[in-house]
Amino acid sequence: MRPLWLLTLLLALSQALPFEQKGFWDFTLDDGLLMMNDEEASGSDTTSGVPDLDSLTPTFSAMCPFGCHCHLRVVQCSDLGLKTVPKEISPDTTLLDLQNNDISELRKDDFKGLQHLYALVLVNNKISKIHEKAFSPLRKLQKLYISKNHLVEIPPNLPSSLVELRIHDNRIRKVPKGVFSGLRNMNCIEMGGNPLENSGFEPGAFDGLKLNYLRISEAKLTGIPKDLPETLNELHLDHNKIQAIELEDLLRYSKLYRLGLGHNQIRMIENGSLSFLPTLRELHLDNNKLSRVPAGLPDLKLLQVVYLHSNNITKVGINDFCPMGFGVKRAYYNGISLFNNPVPYWEVQPATFRCVTDRLAIQFGNYKK
């Protein structure tokens, strides 16, 4: 059994997302943190690449900063009131946890010698300044969590090995062109909770990125940003001030399977806008100002979940969700939420939901008066 404290630490690092994440980017115990490079280090069969933790006798590196806990290449220095990055960190460290401290600056040599570091956690500090070469030694860094700090810009010269960047809840107002240059491995960026407006994204800001996941929630967006990566599978823009979805807004995002637009001010979705999303499986439009079900849902043959609750929908047509006629192939819905709308649910014809797996998948009632 993996040490309980280590599991607790790693699970605590993930931040709440706008709606349920089905394991796509949840931060759990990653085997990469525990990989051993030599048999002597593990004392067990290394054919699998991961040591048998049950057979290991707990050992502590001779290099462990005062007050920190060091075990199995994990250095935990959280909640210590640290003002700076501690010294005497073992060079074979793979996870360094510095969250919940008072660090205000990352200096040039703070991470010197940590060439094996895989994950760096700096959440909830007071970081406002980062030296341009602070991350240079981190040639194997894949996960950088630097949320809930005082950053006003995205750090320069991020490691090219980086896969996941969580930089939400800072003070970033601008995403300049070239800031992500060379990050060919980047897969996930979480940058919600920053005062970003549409004008803050320079043309080409995301050039070269092949992201699967992007979240820009709880910002100041009034529309869907232009020129986001075409490779996106998940795009979360909830809790903004978006008022409308125009025809060209979703044109380049044909690979999306989850789109989050809940908690905005959307009144209008232009006809045909959703036709550019042939692989869409999950659509969140709850807590907006829609007066009708968006057009085009029956044509999205893979769509299975639609959240439309807490809008101003007054009528639901018999063909709003399902294709007309019989024999038209499409995936069955397993979730449609329409509660907290002013539509009288007793007036909706049962055939409206003929392509839903089960009546329990339909959330209706609690209509607005």
From Swiss-Prot:
One of its GO terms (molecular function) is extracellular matrix binding. Found in several connective tissues, especially in articular cartilages. The keyword Coiled coil does not apply. SMART domains: LRR_BAC (SM00364), LRR_TYP (SM00369), LRRNT (SM00013). Pfam families: LRR_8 (PF13855), LRRNT (PF01462). Residues 17-37 form a propeptide. Keywords: Disulfide bond, Extracellular matrix, Glycoprotein, Leucine-rich repeat, Proteoglycan, Repeat, Secreted, Signal. Disulfide bonds join 64-70, 68-77, 322-355. Residues 1-16 form the signal peptide. Its main location: secreted. GO terms for biological process: articular cartilage development; blood vessel remodeling; bone development. It is found in: Secreted, Extracellular space, Extracellular matrix. The two attached glycosaminoglycan chains can be either chondroitin sulfate or dermatan sulfate. One of its GO terms (cellular component) is cell surface. InterPro entries: Leu-rich_rpt, Leu-rich_rpt_typical-subtyp, LRR_dom_sf, LRRNT, SLRP, SLRP_I_decor/aspor/byglycan. PANTHER family: AGAP008170-PA, BIGLYCAN. Homodimer. Forms a ternary complex with MFAP2 and ELN. Belongs to the small leucine-rich proteoglycan (SLRP) family. SLRP class I subfamily. May be involved in collagen fiber assembly. This is Biglycan. It comes from Rattus norvegicus. The gene is Bgn.
